[in-house]
From Swiss-Prot:
Pfam families: Histone. InterPro entries: Histone-fold, Histone_H2A, Histone_H2A/H2B/H3. GO terms for cellular component: host cell cytoplasm; host cell nucleus; virion component. It comes from Melbournevirus (MelV). SUPFAM superfamilies: Histone-fold (SSF47113). Induction: Expression of viral histones begins 2-4 hpi and continues along the infectious cycle. Transmembrane segments: none annotated. This is Histone doublet miniH2B-H2A. Histone-like protein that is recruited to viral factories during viral replication and participates in viral DNA packaging and virion production probably by forming unstable nucleosome-like particles. May compact the viral DNA. It is found in: Host nucleus; Host cytoplasm; Virion. Signal peptide: none annotated. Keywords: DNA condensation, Host cytoplasm, Host nucleus, Virion.
Length: 168
């Protein structure tokens, strides 16, 4: 069973307590996180040589993100690296995803940093989607809510763009 980049169970743990999420929405958020991980690892490989991948490259890439999203995700990643916060997402799945797309030598701090970035972005997506579902007087997050939340949030829209979200 190939579990590379499957975060469904952990996305449920990050979602707001009084929210419910459909299966299609879980797949959508999971696909968005895998897209983000692949995008960041490709950019990090361009910055650093192909031999090793370190966490500095990911933190440097976060400075290019517009607005407060990059700054806050960088703070979250640093707090995870220095042991101030615990991760919910598994680092092994992120490491396998990185190995599939990049070089063979990856530092553990790079894995932790990327996992923290994915977890932070997932939390932001879930928060925005739940507030969008609340506006529609629903407790269950659907793919429409995710799409609307991303299109309304300027920073998330700059990261994910107008991607096709299935399950309408």
């Amino acid at each position: 069973m190939d579990r590379v980049g499957k975060y469904g169970l952990f996305i449920k743990r990050i979602s707001p307590k009084d929210a419910d999420i459909t299966k299609e929405s879980l797949e959508t958020v999971n696909n968005m996180l895998v897209f983000l991980a692949e995008k960041l690892t490709k950019q990090a490989n361009i910055i650093i040589d192909q031999k090793t991948l370190r966490h500095d490259a990911f933190l440097w890439l976060l400075t290019d993100i517009q607005g407060e999203l990059g700054k806050h995700s960088q703070d979250f990643a640093n707090s995870v690296l220095y042991g101030e916060k615990e991760l919910v997402f598994p680092t092994k799945r992120t490491e396998n995803l990185m190995r599939k797309n990049t070089c063979l030598r990856i530092s553990q701090s790079a894995v932790k940093t990327l996992t923290a970035i994915l977890e932070y972005f997932c939390g932001q997506i879930m928060e925005a989607s739940f507030s969008q579902a609340k506006k529609s007087k629903r407790k269950r997050i659907r793919p429409i809510d995710i799409e609307a939340a991303i299109s309304q949030d300027k920073e998330l829209h700059s990261m994910f763009g107008k991607g096709v979200i299935s399950g309408r």
